[in-house]
Amino acid sequence: MDQLFASIHATGQSLLGYYWPLVWNLVKIIAVVAPLMGAVAYLTLWERKVIGWMHVRHGPNRTGPAGLLQPIADGVKLLLKEIVVPAKSSKALFVIAPIMTIMPALAAWAVIPFGPETVLADVNAGLLFVMAITSLEVYGVIVAGWASNSKYAFLGAMRASAQMISYEIAMGFVLVIILMVTGSMNLTTIVNTQNTGRFAEMGLTFLSWNWLPLLPMFFIYIISGTAELNRHPFDVVEGESEIVAGHMVEYSGMSFAMFFLAEYANMWLISIMATLMFLGGWTSPIDMAPFTWVPGWIWLGLKTLMVVTMFIWFRASFPRYRYDQIMRLGWKVFIPLTLVYLLIVAIWMKTPWNIWN
């Protein structure tokens, strides 16, 4: 594979000369964004199928074989729908808000590694970059609610922004703990450090991953990620019985769809981040045949799909929280817990039982 890429790079350099680096970067961006958009589209089908199975029904099964063309039909339908801009809205901000929401969700994938050498930008501060870029999404939500000139949209935006900012703090402390135990913010290095230790030497790699010693932080990260996404059971932002679609209530057509594209792209992002930080990334759970025969990118995909399916399971199983319960959970439970565990890990690393040496 490396020889193939080297050959392509040399051929492109000889043909395009000075412009080749720009063209090559565009090719790499398309190679990440195009499959991501396909994964986002088919995640909607997977969600409807899984919830259908949990409800003892089939889910979408009429459009194409086994309903496989349903996401394409939904996309065509949304493309053909009219985008209505409310008469008394702030038109420029109303149009920009969906773009402000989806751009950070896509930009964060620049530093996500899909293998030991497969990453768009292998930066040393990858963990910090993801946290910083995803924090910008709250601005799109606030702008959408304010520009719509609707009390329901504005209330939904205020709820969303407060909820997202609150749970970002707990997620931030979890990332600090990951930084402490791995000694790096580079996501590739974080994966590699989980493939060492006594259990890894025995071939039981899955016991050397961070999920075991940092199990409470793994759960806090997943639950905080659910709240960050404004998904059930933390979806009071768009509670059907209260404020309908929240900050998206005045949107239609593709502008409405862009908010959902951002949500599902973030579902994949949070899931793959959980896989990289806690579940060993692309490494095999058992370092022996036949597990080692499976390519690393398949292991990465399977683990990420497992975490994504957890989000869907939450939606199908749990009742919605009240807004005050959501804020209490974030501020009075998760933030103190992460601070205490931060101290515990710091002391643990100074003892002879430090497992991260």
UniProtKB/Swiss-Prot annotation:
Q: Is the Oxidoreductase keyword given for this protein?
A: no
User: How does this chain sit within the bilayer?
Assistant: Multi-pass membrane protein
Q: Does the keyword Flavoprotein apply?
A: no
| EC class name | translocase
Q: Which molecular function terms from Gene Ontology are attached? A: NADH dehydrogenase activity; oxidoreductase activity, acting on NAD(P)H, quinone or similar compound as acceptor; quinone binding
EC assignment: the record states: 7.1.1.-
Residues spanning the membrane: 26-46, 92-112, 127-147, 164-184, 203-223, 259-279, 294-314, 329-349
Which reaction does this chain catalyze?
a quinone + NADH + 5 H(+)(in) = a quinol + NAD(+) + 4 H(+)(out)
Q: Which domain of life is it from?
A: Bacteria
How it assembles, according to the record, is:
NDH-1 is composed of 14 different subunits. Subunits NuoA, H, J, K, L, M, N constitute the membrane sector of the complex.
Job of this protein: NDH-1 shuttles electrons from NADH, via FMN and iron-sulfur (Fe-S) centers, to quinones in the respiratory chain. The immediate electron acceptor for the enzyme in this species is believed to be ubiquinone. Couples the redox reaction to proton translocation (for every two electrons transferred, four hydrogen ions are translocated across the cytoplasmic membrane), and thus conserves the redox energy in a proton gradient. This subunit may bind ubiquinone.
PANTHER family tied to this protein: NADH DEHYDROGENASE SUBUNIT 1, NADH-UBIQUINONE OXIDOREDUCTASE CHAIN 1
Protein name (Swiss-Prot/TrEMBL): NADH-quinone oxidoreductase subunit H
